[in-house]
Curated annotation (Swiss-Prot):
It comes from the Eukaryota. This is Pleckstrin homology domain-containing family H member 1. Residues 194-203, 256-265, 285-297 have a biased composition (Polar residues). GO terms for cellular component: cytoskeleton. Gene3D superfamilies: 1.20.80.10, MyTH4 domain (1.25.40.530), Phosphatidylinositol 3-kinase Catalytic Subunit, Chain A, domain 1 (3.10.20.90), Pleckstrin-homology domain (PH domain)/Phosphotyrosine-binding domain (PTB) (2.30.29.30). It comes from Mus musculus (Mouse). Residues 572-666, 681-790 form the PH domain. Residues 27-172, 359-407 form a coiled coil. Residues 826-980 form the MyTH4 domain. Residues 179-203, 256-314, 354-414 are annotated as: Disordered. The keyword Repeat applies. Residues 991-1327 form the FERM domain.
């Protein structure tokens, strides 16, 4: 045992363990190898098994075929009569018949399914219509019931008051009835002058009710003057007892109505307690007479909508009769003033619901909605009325019993929580600014004002590339752009506008229709007045000042024919007729009689003035130009330094005038480039001398596709002519040709001794000679003309171009040895000459420099730390190609050369592909080069390799560029870095950028190098669950690179990459000394730009949330009027949405401090959601008190969900009539800059409003129907207004308003107004196309007479 123990002790167990582990490891290696071998063997056996099974199946199939063949051969030999074949044919026909039957049954089944689906859809539509009708009907009945209750209550009170008056009448002598009680506050009486004088009111019009009974004598009612005076005495008594403080005013009002002779019409003008409206109105008016559209005036006497009386009713004897009468009120038509007694019951607070003819229907609908909300949130009656009702109970017990028996059941009302009702009640009078100290208010005022009036930066010119500040006019209710540059007062001729004064408001009285003369008067027919000359010939209407029937417009038109065309010769062609001309100072349309005669255009006020001196004259010579925008209903006649904006009364007359002027000037109308369609751009262009039939002319030439165009100048967009090049014979000729000698003898002598000559000889046409200045230009034109003609001249062009031509002739045969030609493949050495034909030696030098830049980009490895080196190289090279389009094909050829047959050096080849990936979204090469690039990309496309994936990415980029067009700016740093440091082929959208929202969140959206803003927003809306911008009104904005508080709206056709690049470029120009990388990046914001009330029903939750946060931002910035109390309530709602329920603060310890977390949160809420003007300069005690009140308001919202808070917030905010409007700070141009008077210009769906900058009270509102012209005028914003015709004088006023604003704000204001006008026009046209039964019922028509259509203009 001892020996065994010694042996065991002598064993080294550690070495033993290591040896065993080594053996185990070797065993595992052997086992893994065995498993691998076994797996390979099994896989091989399985593959062999599959192959064997496949062979067996093939063999079985062959055996079956052979057996069938043997059977057929046997059957044919046995049955020689062919009965089997006949049976086979019968079976085949049966199978075909079955198939046809099955197909017929399937078609019937599909038809039945479609029919069932259509029937179900029709049923659903009918159900929806029925539901909508029932809802509208219930709302109407509920409103009618509410008003009937109110009317019944008022009638009961009147009966009770009359009973009391009768009782007092028996006890009081008649001499004491008209004595005014002592203590009655005196009021200014209403003057008995014109009917539109204002009636003084109390400062709180919502709590007063003016009840006036005005009896009018009619047959069967009052038979004598005594009865009339008695009724008046009773009414005076009743009125003095119910409202003793208003007795004198009511008496004066009655006497005033009696003097006017129309007691059924009451013209009132609610007084504004704020002095801003009156003073602003007085400062604007420069001439007497006429009313301004949009002003808060009542309906004039005799005008539509001015009757405030109830229809004829019989005197009720009991309350039951009065209830029946009131119930019958809405179904009876209104009768004239001389047929019945009228009882006028007017609520002064609701006087604004009565619209003048110039007011818009949308305001009336808003008032109806407010009334509906008031009925929903109806609280208990005021205590004063309750006490009055209690005092009358004892005197009318029987009447109340009768009333209770006949009173309908009270409809169920939706009752809001107490705190919500309190917010709504506060909102009814809280849409105004609270008073603050003058120092604080001025600080807040100028904090929001001057920043908006700052001078614009350089970025605005880049974002709005061609459109600096446009000018729009209203034609047929639509906003039509007539100029893309601001107006200059003298640019349009001033011969007919000498009487106007260039000031802030210029007024031009215009005559309206004479009431004594009509279109059908015998005098007009006798004098030969044409109907078409006095009214519109097409679907246009004539402006009010253009359709006057004064004597000077009634001359016979046979004196000078309306349209006379005697010859096609320029000097002999004559024409005359009416055109609408834009005035030079007051930018509005004026109807003038134009005469085209002897190469001149003369215009007069009327045809009768042709014997006098013309108001203007235009000489039509070779310097004249006709400009017409695409699909525009206006055109510009440019002569020298003057531009005449003209339009006709119908599209046919407009086309006729343009055609005549075009024939006279022997040029086509200049407009947008119609020949560059589908992304096609000129292959080569330049100044050439064209010689044909011995006549030479220096023209601007461009080769587009296979057509040669020539223009008068490089600025023209319509050619003088064109020449087809397809199959033409192109060659260079010596200078001994006749046309050359004739040209030199002509003395033009510009290219006398060094020019080259090319001839273009199309089939079946005479040859045309081109005289070219230099050899480089000649080579370029010769090569591109030869390629366009389809020639195969091997000696034309460079060697590279000749090889591409040969490949095209071989249709890109992949086995052609030309693909491996040394000229087409990679070369390590630099180029000695350009690969393409270039028109000048300077461009050839640039091509060689471009190749060196590409070589540096390709051969230097890209590192993340020094990526800016490659960014600068790529941007510089591509910027050169954008500046010189001739080099765009050159850089593609250079990159294709360096990619083809390149040695396998990974990073160099990848960087070459990356540079190509940067080129593809920017621009494309021309024609045959583009074909060659596509062939090369197809040859390299391979999803298994990295270079092949780059080729596939470049293919997609080329196709996208062909679809969406080329870019305008070089790639941005973000774009270059994304291509260099990320693999773009792994993503369908290789770039991404965050889009910020008003609530502080953001959404990352992907895009590619060709994505437009419309495509970008479509992806954004899909990811966020929002509607398209045409419905939601949202738009994409960028911040300003200068850091100022400016935002720039991006148009839908702009490309995202271009906007980012221009932003970065502007930032570098503003900070040239900083590093290339920089720390700032562009910030994209998605905000509401246009607000449409008709689209409110379809709002999504996300839209409502963003709209609430945007409104909160406007409140904080001081661009939304709310009182301090209402601002606190709304800030608490936003705090509940943003942070949830307010946590109860924990009590501090014995030696602790009060909780600072809650205080910090409250301070943060006040900073984010409470108006700055109410916080700035406030003492600390007031701020602490404000925080305590905020905590109380916030705690009351415990448990309220964010969607519920958003609903309440928007309901409150929408009580401001200008909710959704965009406010722009501006300064009236008639004031000197030292005065520093700033106003708000509010642009909304209904029109343009001018607001006081300090109080935000509306001074005046101009509906879009009164706006004729708007946009830039020099450096200011111009607004031309046509007022409503005055009914007494029949004249209108043309007012031109100008405001000082920054150029970006002017552009944004103009574009926003145009968007609103076109949207309103489209909505009106859509509703007009609907059947009458489907049109929504206008609630305004239930109470007021509809506004009748005026005889004004539909054109303006």
């Amino acid at each position: 045992m001892a020996e065994v123990k010694v042996e065991v002790a002598s064993i080294d167990w550690q070495k033993r363990c290591l040896s065993l582990e080594t053996q185990l490891f070797r065993f595992r290696l052997q086992a893994s190898k065995i498993r691998e071998l076994l797996a390979d063997k099994m896989q091989e056996l399985e593959q062999r098994l599959l192959e064997a099974e496949q062979r067996a199946e093939n063999a079985e199939t062959q055996v079956g075929v052979m057996e069938e063949k043997i059977k057929l051969s046997n059957l044919k030999s046995v049955d020689s009569t062919g009965t089997l074949h006949q049976k086979y044919q019968e079976l085949l026909r049966a199978v075909q018949g079955k198939d046809e039957l099955i197909s017929q049954l399937q078609a019937q089944l599909e038809k039945q399914k479609q029919t069932r689906a259509e029937e179900a859809k029709i049923v659903q539509e009918k159900a929806a219509k029925i539901k909508e009708w029932v809802t509208v009907k219930l709302a109407e009945l509920e409103m009618e019931n509410q008003q009937l209750k109110t009317c019944n209550q008022q009638l009961v009170e009147q009966v009770a008051a009359l009973q009391d008056a009768l009782e007092d009448l028996r006890m009081t002598p008649s001499e004491e009835l008209l004595v005014v009680p002592e203590g009655t506050p005196e009021r200014d009486p209403v003057p008995s002058g014109p009917s539109d004088q204002p009636v003084e009111q109390d400062s709180n019009p919502h709590t007063q009710i003016l009840k006036v009974a005005v009896p009018t004598p009619s047959l069967g009612t009052l038979q004598s003057r005594d009865s009339l005076s008695e009724a008046r005495s009773l009414e005076d008594l009743r009125f003095s007892m119910v409202h003793p403080g208003e007795t004198a005013e009511a008496k004066t009002l009655q006497s005033h109505l009696q003097k006017e002779g129309s007691p059924s019409q009451l013209c009132m003008k609610p007084g504004n307690p704020k002095h801003g409206s009156a003073s602003y109105r007085e400062s604007l008016v420069t001439a007497q007479g006429g009313t301004f559209p949009g002003t808060k005036t009542s309906a004039r006497e005799g005008g539509p909508g001015s009757s405030l009386t109830l229809p004829k009713v019989r005197a009720p004897s009991i309350p039951r009769d009065s209830f029946q009468v009131a119930k019958r009120h809405h179904s009876q038509p209104q009768v004239g003033p001389g047929h019945c007694d009228h009882v006028v019951s007017i609520e002064i607070g609701a006087l604004s619901a009565l619209h003048s003819p110039g007011s818009s229907k949308s305001e009336a609908r808003a008032k109806v909605r407010e009334e509906a909300e008031k009925m929903e949130m109806e609280a208990l009656p005021p205590s004063g009325k309750q006490e009055e009702r209690e005092s009358l109970k004892s005197r009318r017990g029987e009447l109340e019993d009768v009333e209770l028996e006949n009173k309908p059941p009270t409809p169920p009302l939706h009752r809001f929580p107490s705190w919500e009702s309190r917010i709504y009640a506060m909102a009814t009078s809280g849409m105004q600014l609270s008073e603050v100290s003058s120092r604080r208010s001025n600080a807040a005022c100028y904090a929001s004002g001057p920043s908006a009036l700052a001078f614009p930066g350089a970025f605005s010119g880049l974002v709005y590339k061609n459109v600096t500040v446009p000018v729009y006019t209203a034609l047929k209710g639509k906003a039509t752009q007539i100029s893309n540059v601001p107006f200059v007062d003298e640019s349009s001729g001033s011969d007919d506008d000498c009487g106007s004064q260039a000031s802030f408001r210029m007024s031009v009285p215009c005559s309206e229709y004479r009431k004594t003369s009509g279109l059908g008067s015998p005098r007009a027919i006798k004098r030969g007045v044409s109907m078409s000359s006095l009214s519109s010939e097409g679907d246009y209407a004539i402006p009010p000042d253009a359709c006057s029937l004064d004597s000077d417009y009634s001359e016979p038109e046979h004196k000078l024919q309306r349209t006379s065309s005697y010859s096609t010769d320029g000097e002999a062609l004559e024409k005359s007729g009416y055109l609408l001309k834009m005035g030079s100072r007051v930018k509005t349309w004026k109807r003038r009689w134009f005469v085209l005669r002897q190469g001149q255009i003369l215009y007069y006020k009327s045809p009768s003035d042709v014997i006098r001196k013309p108001q203007g004259q235009v000489d039509l010579n070779s310097h004249c130009q006709i400009v017409r925008e695409e699909e525009a209903q206006t055109f510009q006649l440019i002569s020298g330094n003057k531009t005449y904006y003209l339009t006709a009364e119908s599209p046919s007359l407009l086309e006729e005038w343009i055609r005549v002027l075009q024939s006279l000037l022997k040029v086509q109308v200049t407009g947008p480039p119609a020949l560059h369609q589908g992304g096609t751009k000129p292959t080569v262009k330049g100044w050439l001398t064209k010689v044909k039939h011995g006549h030479s002319k220096l023209v601007w030439c461009a080769l587009v596709g296979k057509t040669f165009y020539y223009y008068r100048s490089h600025e023209d967009k319509r050619p003088l002519g064109c020449l087809p090049v397809q199959d033409a014979h192109i060659e260079e000729v010596d200078r001994s040709c006749d046309s050359d000698e004739d040209y030199e003898a002509g003395g033009t002598g510009r290219l006398l001794s060094s020019h080259c000559t090319l001839v273009i000889h199309p089939p079946e046409h005479s040859p045309t000679y081109l005289l070219i200045g230099t050899k480089h230009e000649k080579d370029t034109w010769l090569y591109h003309l030869t390629v366009a003609a389809g020639g195969s001249n091997a000696k034309v062009g460079t060697v590279y171009e000749q090889l591409i031509g040969k490949l095209m002739d071989g249709e890109g045969n992949p086995d052609s040895p030309l693909w491996r030609h040394p000229m087409l493949c990679y070369s390590q050495e630099g180029l000695c000459a350009s690969l393409t034909t270039l028109p000048s030696e300077a461009l050839q030098t640039e091509a060689l420099k471009l190749f060196k830049s590409c070589q540096l980009f390709i051969n230097v490895p890209v590192e993340a730390a020094s990526v800016d080196y490659h960014v600068s190289l790529a941007q510089t090279a591509l910027q050169v190609c954008l500046v010189h389009p001739e080099l765009q094909s050159e850089i593609y050829c250079q990159l294709m050369k360096q990619i083809s047959c390149r040695p396998p050096q990974k990073y160099s080849l990848m960087q070459c592909w990356q540079l190509l990936a940067l080129c593809a979204p920017l621009f494309l090469p021309q024609h045959h080069f583009l074909w060659y690039v596509k062939q090369q990309l197809q040859r390299h496309a391979d999803p298994r390799s990295e270079t092949g994936q780059y080729a596939i990415y470049c293919q997609r980029a080329v196709e996208r560029t062909l679809q969406t067009g080329e870019r305008e700016a070089r790639p941005s740093r973000m774009e270059v870095v994304s291509i260099l440091l990320r693999n773009p082929f792994h993503h369908s959208l290789p770039f991404s950028i965050p889009v910020h929202f008003a609530n502080g969140t953001y959404q990352v959206v992907g895009f590619d190098g060709s994505s437009t803003v419309d495509e970008f927003l479509q992806r954004l809306n899909q990811e966020t669950g929002m509607r398209k911008p045409s419905q939601s009104g949202f738009a994409l904005f960028t911040d300003d690179p200068s850091g100022r508080d400016l935002e720039h709206c991006l148009q839908g056709r702009v490309k995202i990459c271009d906007a980012i690049s221009k932003w970065e470029q502007t930032l570098k120009e503003l900070h040239p000394g900083k590093s290339e990388g920089g720390t700032r990046v562009v910030k994209l914001m998605y905000k509401n730009r246009l607000y449409f009330r008709s689209q409110v029903k379809g709002e999504t939750e996300r839209e409502r949330l963003l709209l609430a946060f945007q409104a909160s931002g406007e409140i904080v910035a001081g661009r939304f009027p709310v009182t301090k109390e209402l601002a606190l309530e709304m800030a608490a709602l936003m705090a509940q949405v943003e942070y949830g329920d307010l946590e109860k603060p924990t009590l501090p310890g014995p030696g602790g401090t009060p909780p600072t977390k809650a205080q910090h949160l409250l301070q943060q809420v006040l900073d984010r959601f409470y108006p700055r003007r109410y916080r700035n300069g406030a003492p600390p005690e007031q701020l602490r008190h404000l925080a305590d009140m905020m905590a109380t308001k916030w705690a009351a919202l415990q448990g309220c969900s964010p969607p519920e808070c958003i609903r309440i917030y928007l309901t409150v905010a929408r009580k401001w009539p200008l909710f959704g409007a965009k406010l722009f700070a501006a300064q009236p141009a008639q004031l000197s800059p030292k005065e520093n008077t700033v106003v708000w210009i509010a642009v909304n769906e209904d029109g343009v409003s001018i607001l006081d900058h300090r109080t935000m009270q509306v001074n005046i509102t101009y509906p879009y129907s009164s706006v004729t012209t708007f946009g830039g005028c020099r450096d200011d914003f111009m607004l031309v207004i046509r007022s409503i015709p005055d009914q007494s004088s029949g004249k209108t006023r043309i007012d031109k308003l100008t405001f000082r604003m920054p150029a970006p704000k002017i552009t944004e204001t103009t574009l926003m107004m145009a968007s609103y006008m076109n949207h309103c026009s489209a909505t009106v046209n859509l509703s007009a196309k609907l059947p009458a039964a489907r049109q929504p019922r206008d609630l305004d028509g239930q109470f007021f007479a509809s506004v009748s259509c005026t005889k004004g203009s539909a054109l303006l």
